[in-house]
């Protein structure tokens, strides 16, 4: 079952956007643009409609969830019986191909983690053909291809890709999900740590232009960042919502988000 809408956080590269649940699952992502078909659509259905979860294998408690400073870089921490782990989620500013980057950091102890990648194209209707190619995982469906580059090996099961791994204090594991037209050669994945630094710098530099210094400045800046994240970069148009088909009121007709 999808989470409550208030439990989702937005990440964006100003050409597309994803919703990340408090449980570590990306349940909504239209790739490569806001108006493209979704490759993760569990938000509107079930997990089988597509999601990508990176979280402690045995559960745990989400103890902290925040954006890093004045950015759209999301940071989530879990406390488990084995220790504490942090997951950083963001979408780098677009270079040639769109990316979703997830970085797992060990804070203390040694925490068993799991990545479950269940790609479903066309809003959950199409199960892609998945194979390992050139050290990456490739999921292809018609004209679309999504590639996963990671330092953690994945294996297939039940039409999904899984990775079980352990992260110790001070260690990092990285995941880069990239869209590309299926007729092109595989994309060159971004360097996750460099992309993190550049993404934080982009958002914080932009937010620093806000001259408002009155009450609730943090809330004002966060609202501006959210609007910027929903602004389609090539035209400056603001999308009505990052999602679709969520009712303004349950049972009512206002379902355009």
Describe these PLM feature segments:
Residues 1-257:
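Acidic, mature catalytic/reactive cores of soluble proteins
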